[in-house]
Amino acid sequence: PGKYSDNRLNATYAFGGFELLDATLTENFGISIDGNLEVDFTGFEAIMDRVGGIDIELTSAEAAYINKRNHTSIVAGLNHLNGAEALTYARARKIDSDFGRTERQRKVLLSMYEQAKNLSVTELLGLMYNILSYITTDLTDSEILSLLYRLLPLASSISINSYTVPADDCYYYASIRGMSVLVPDLPRIRQCLEEYLPLE
């Protein structure tokens, strides 16, 4: 959008923050964004530790990757990861691909949700108070608390699903201006999103 030329989607936040990111998602995918949250690596580690860590099923390659960078002795299988270990897991790309990395990131978020939803209302409010300083957002504190209060009654029964964009058969690989990129089939992606999400 605006003065910017075609580029990787993940460049939009660096170029223009939340405003450009939201405009780009809306223009390309027809999705209206209600609010944004951003956490840096330091904040990510701190939030994970505040939640109490997360349970993640690791492959042998993932366990070896975490061990190499954290001087730990984790083995394949179900592991309880602290903030530093969870960050290493979420950032891992060289053991497979970008698609593998984004899948790990989704697993981290879902596991964190599973961990947090078992907290009491008092514990959740205390957690929110402690982690807000690590979050950059265009939502007000009152909007965040309002969303939290709306979520609390549903937390024990709500089911969260994730969806990857671009989906299979909705892109092709190319080299553009020296960048290795996935070129999206935007009409097909919009169609898939309309089938998956209740878009307005």
PLM regions: where:
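Non-catalytic, solvent-exposed segments at the cell envelope interface
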Residues: P1-E200
